């Protein structure tokens, strides 16, 4: 599970930061990539990475401001010409279906793969045997959501060496034991799968704030998260301005991470007014409250390891 930041700027593209998009690479887990937001030129940013558009399985949109969605029609269209045959599901607030379908319709675009557009509310928006994705409303002046991606616990590994030591050779019986079944061997011995399975591996959690003022729902999304990705549009000296524009300061992002007991904070959605050393000041302001903080930059990668 890896994060790749395709765009980390705010509002409009800048020379050093494109507008918002984050890829959650789940290549080992499910051979796919999920995107969170898809600002203008996201597909161009992808060209500078190893991501293959055909591997993009899901796109989660936080809200419908242009710097988060203007890249969506182009990417959805281009995926048809880049080997995309598998289904693509787009999740977002009310209006995402009209926006995307209208853009594709008036441009005469016909995708060659199953495209599903789901307008979401609060609660579980996706769940399978591996992951559960939860959305909650955040404070941004228009309908907007943050997301929590929670990996389900992975069953422990079968202790093959211990089985060999008691004379149980690899074969179909291993799968039964791995499933936790009780097995009677040919020699009459009975063994229990639970005795040969290691402890489960804790699932990982990553939370996305989207654009928002500080609010309780972001804390709920980020509770005990391995990583919280939180917008930091303003420095702490502009706290009032941040509130007026429904954004957060880096200091407020850190306060949220601390109160949610997150393990790591990654700042993004950084205004073009902050360059070079000014970005370091944003990080320092956050670190004073939540030490394990970094500021993302375009193409920054972070592996979310199991703990």
Swiss-Prot record:
Active site (record annotation): 67
UniProt-annotated binding residues for Zn(2+) 1: 63, 65, 140, 211
Protein name per Swiss-Prot or TrEMBL: Ribonuclease Z
Keywords: Endonuclease, Hydrolase, Metal-binding, Nuclease, tRNA processing, Zinc
Function summary: Zinc phosphodiesterase, which displays some tRNA 3'-processing endonuclease activity. Probably involved in tRNA maturation, by removing a 3'-trailer from precursor tRNA.
EC number from the UniProt entry: 3.1.26.11
Positions annotated to bind Zn(2+) 2: 67-68, 211, 269
Family: Belongs to the RNase Z family.
Catalytic activity as recorded in UniProt: Endonucleolytic cleavage of RNA, removing extra 3' nucleotides from tRNA precursor, generating 3' termini of tRNAs. A 3'-hydroxy group is left at the tRNA terminus and a 5'-phosphoryl group is left at the trailer molecule
GO molecular function terms noted in the UniProt entry: 3'-tRNA processing endoribonuclease activity; zinc ion binding
One Pfam family, short name: Lactamase_B_2
Subunit structure, interactors included: Homodimer.
Cofactor binding note: Binds 2 Zn(2+) ions.
Cofactor: Zn(2+)
SS bond list: none
């Amino acid at each position: 599970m890896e994060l790749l930041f395709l765009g980390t700027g705010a509002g409009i593209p800048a020379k050093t930061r494109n507008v918002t998009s984050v890829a959650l690479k789940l290549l080992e887990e499910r051979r796919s990539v999920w995107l969170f937001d898809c600002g203008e030129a996201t597909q161009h940013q992808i060209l500078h990475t190893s991501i293959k558009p055909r591997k993009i399985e899901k796109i989660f949109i936080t809200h419908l401001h242009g710097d988060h969605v203007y890249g969506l029609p182009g990417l959805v269209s281009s995926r048809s010409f880049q080997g995309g045959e598998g289904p693509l599901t787009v999740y977002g607030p009310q209006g995402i279906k009209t926006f995307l379908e209208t853009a594709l319709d008036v441009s005469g675009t016909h995708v060659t793969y199953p495209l599903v557009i789901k307008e979401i509310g609060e609660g579980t928006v996706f769940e399978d045997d591996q992951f559960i994705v939860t959305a909650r409303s955040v404070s941004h002046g228009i309908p907007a959501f943050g997301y929590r991606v929670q990996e389900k616990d992975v069953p422990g590994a079968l202790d093959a060496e211990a089985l060999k030591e008691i004379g149980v050779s690899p074969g179909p019986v291993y799968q039964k034991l791995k499933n936790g079944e009780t097995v009677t061997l040919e020699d009459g011995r009975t063994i229990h799968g639970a005795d040969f399975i290691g402890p489960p591996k804790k699932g990982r959690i990553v939370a996305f704030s989207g654009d928002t003022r500080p609010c309780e729902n972001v804390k709920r999304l980020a509770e005990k998260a391995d990583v919280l990705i939180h917008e930091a549009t303003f420095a702490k000296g502009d706290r009032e301005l941040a509130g007026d524009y429904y954004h957060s300061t880096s200091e407020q992002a850190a306060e949220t991470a601390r109160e949610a007991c997150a393990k790591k904070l990654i700042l993004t959605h950084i205004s073009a007014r902050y360059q070079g050393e000014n970005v370091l000041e944003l990080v320092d302001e956050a670190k004073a409250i939540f030490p394990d903080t970094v500021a993302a930059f375009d193409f920054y990668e972070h592996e979310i390891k199991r703990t």
